[in-house]
Amino acid sequence: MPDPGWAARTPEANDLLLTAGTGVGTHLANQTAWTTLGASHHASGVASAINTAATAASWLGVGSAASALNVTMLNATLHGLAGWVDVKPAVVSTAIAAFETANAAMRPAPECMENRDEWGVDNAINPSVLWTLTPRIVSLDVEYFGVMWPNNAAVGATYGGVLAALAESLAIPPPVATMGASPAAPAQAAAAVGQAAAEAAAGDGMRSAYQGVQAGSTGAGQSTSAGENFGNQLSTFMQPMQAVMQAAPQALQAPSGLMQAPMSAMQPLQSMVGMFANPGALGMGGAAPGASAASAAGGISAAATEVGAGGGGAALGGGGMPATSFTRPVSAFESGTSGRPVGLRPSGALGADVVRAPTTTVGGTPIGGMPVGHAAGGHRGSHGKSEQAATVRVVDDRR
């Protein structure tokens, strides 16, 4: 409805109210938007009609006819919407024209305010000039109240009326679009929504059940872990007992170790006793005198016996020093003839140097820090002992 305040406000207030806004700038922007939207709707309707005409030849059957009918209805509705939009630019254009008309018809606010200022000054000086300014004061009131006020009020009211009419035109709703799908589409959409809700509820229930099972499995795993922890603690508690059981056999082995210590200490004494019991172990196997010179065979046997005895001593003495053999120098013994002339020795006769076997010296094994025994007879000359040479006398009966 029109604004009833136009007649109640002063002329300058109405003019300021009309010109206080943004002017026609917003009206022009709105008009351009409506024009663009209408052109878009028209272009879409035309394109849809062309597409329908181009593809209708390849459609067959009842479905093809129904589809073509639906497309035609939708295109008609789109064109109707475009027609509804086409009205809006004209409405906005009318509003722009109404504003410009009202703005031009309004008495400007400065003019109205100047009238009031002059009226006030005249009233102030009128008594001093013997009321000669009274006609001017009356004319100012007539102009202000008889012309400016009614004019601005009328212009504002007219402008308000035009805008009210245009607002009613803008309030007309757009045409209702026809249903391009099946009439059962809303019911199917509602069923789809219900099915989606049911599936969502079922999914929530399954998730809740899974979470419950998972929580139960977690509790069972925790119980099993608690049992394992108890078993570990029990085994830890039994470890001191196992250590005690392992220490008992070691304690029983200690007395046997104490018995073995004296036996180990007696082993050097036993070795010394065995050494004195066996002369060969002390290197005395070679000290036996040589065999009689009565027969060569007996001498050879005695020499062999001496060597055997020395070998036995070496065998009993151990492997501390290897057995050595040597032949005494010739200057240490008498010659075979002792300076007496003898006949020629027949072949096959044995002399002293042949019968006498080489002296064998066997070293003993060091026992308990004792020095190694000297070879039997090997170093007797150095100790001043006399050596008795073994000789063989051969009698030649062929004379």
Swiss-Prot record:
Protein name in the entry = Uncharacterized PPE family protein PPE69
Pfam families hit by this protein: PPE (PF00823)
Taxonomic source organism: Mycobacterium tuberculosis (strain ATCC 25618 / H37Rv)
- State the similarity comment: Belongs to the mycobacterial PPE family.
Q: Which InterPro entries match?
A: PPE_dom, PPE_sf
Enumerate the residue ranges of region (Disordered).
Answer: 375-399
